[in-house]
């Protein structure tokens, strides 16, 4: 696994993992507070999104496990809390160096082309290309304001096109 709790910077690694596990925006994860985590419902409440609305992010068992292993810093309400003395009570800064290490371990060569927002693109593309989720599912998961934002990920693979063709044949022959 690319994200280990024993890494030098557990908060940074966990932050990066949460981006890929939720498809949330960088700011939604960085500004998450412990009071917004509902352990029973496995959700994270985001009081203010880019779209000016609140939203609920549903957390997987793995995401909950990652959150449970994070230390709570006294006097700091943030899930991804800075441990630096001069940043007491604030979230961590953008962990670009940690992200660089993750990208290197993953064998990604064009690291200059990859940013934190790329995680959202990766999540959306993975959901759409799996064939298990609709564009409306992607819209909801990523909190897109409109379906048009989600449509950019709707690229048909040759395998998917072949499956559609076979499915049509099966329907006609039935």
Task: Enumerate the predicted regions with their spans.
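Basic, Lys/Arg- and aromatic-enriched nucleic-acid-binding interface segment
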Residues: 1-26, 30-31, 40, 50-54, ...
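N-terminal core-binding DNA-recognition domain of tyrosine site-specific recombinases/integrases
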Residues: 7-9, 53, 86-94, 110-115
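Short, leucine-enriched amphipathic alpha-helices that occur as contiguous helical runs
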Residues: 11-13, 63, 92, 120-121
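C-terminal catalytic core of tyrosine-transesterase DNA break-rejoin enzymes
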Residues: 14-17, 21-28, 118-145, 152
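Short, polar N-cap/turn motifs at the start of nucleic acid-interacting alpha helices
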Residues: 36-43, 112-113, 132-152, 163
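Catalytic-site neighborhood detector that most strongly recognizes the C-terminal catalytic loop/helix
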Residues: 48-52, 86, 142-167
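Non-catalytic DNA-binding core/recognition domains of DNA-processing enzymes
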Residues: 59, 95, 99
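C-terminal secondary-structure termini that scaffold catalytic or DNA-interacting sites
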Residues: 69, 76, 81-87, 163-174
């Amino acid at each position: 696994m690319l994200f280990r709790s024993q890494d030098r910077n557990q908060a940074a690694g966990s932050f990066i993992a949460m981006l890929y596990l939720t498809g949330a925006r960088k700011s939604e994860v960085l500004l998450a507070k412990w009071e917004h985590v509902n352990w029973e419902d496995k959700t994270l409440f985001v009081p203010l999104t880019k779209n000016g609305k609140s939203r609920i992010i549903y957390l997987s068992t793995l995401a909950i496990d990652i959150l449970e292993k994070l230390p709570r810093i006294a006097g700091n309400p943030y899930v991804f809390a800075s441990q630096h003395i001069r940043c007491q009570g604030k979230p961590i800064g953008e962990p670009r160096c940690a992200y660089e290490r993750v990208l290197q371990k993953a064998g990604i060569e064009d690291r200059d082309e990859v940013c934190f927002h790329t995680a959202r693109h990766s999540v959306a593309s993975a959901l759409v290309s799996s064939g298990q989720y609709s564009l409306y599912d992607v819209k909801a998961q990523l909190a897109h304001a409109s379906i048009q934002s989600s449509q950019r990920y709707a690229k048909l693979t040759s395998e998917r096109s072949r499956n559609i063709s076979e499915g049509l044949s099966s329907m006609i022959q039935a």
